[in-house]
Amino acid sequence: MILTIKIWRLSLAKFLNMRRFVGLLLILLVGFAVYRFYIKPKYKSESGPKMAPIALKEHTERFNGSVDKMMAAYLDIKNAFVEEDTGRAKQSTQIFIALLDSVPLQELKKDTASIFETAQSNLNDIKANAASLLSQSDINEMRKDFSMVTEMLYPSFFKTINYEGPQLYLQNCPMAFGDDQPANWISNNIQVVNPYLGKQHPKYKATMLHCGSVKDSIRGK
């Protein structure tokens, strides 16, 4: 009987000691958590905030000037289609093709050969579609070639050369060649003036002249 009581007291003492140990452990854990999340100061990088990369001018004035002149001719083609003037559209296209050849792509070789080759391929595709426009007699077919020239210019050519000229806008007509055939064009004005439906459309007349939307902003540096 006495032995049983001693064993029971010993077990109770161990139990109480265990409870004190667990209680102390909990206090330590809670204290650490308070310090970790509420008291300890946050680490601050000595290098400071990360800076955005600075855009540097990469092309010469000659290169950018030639691209600007090329785009001025493109915009003349667009404006001719707004007026339904096929003669002016072809004349402006001839100027546009000549100005394509004046872009000094050799300057791009200072970057990498692949950039030069891609830009050269882009210009060849643009020139082929512009030449096709000259061979057309139907204004609708001419406009289709104009839309292909646009697709080759942006994003293809402009992205390749890292365009640095004045701000332009990529605009879209959802029904350029029918209710479900959209087409894009580039403008130097955010206001939509549609070269595919124009001022003298056989069905809509001038009522759809401002039909369309701005899809993208083409920002130079």
State each model region's role.
Residues I2-K221:
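Intrinsically disordered, low-complexity terminal tails/loops enriched in metal-binding residues
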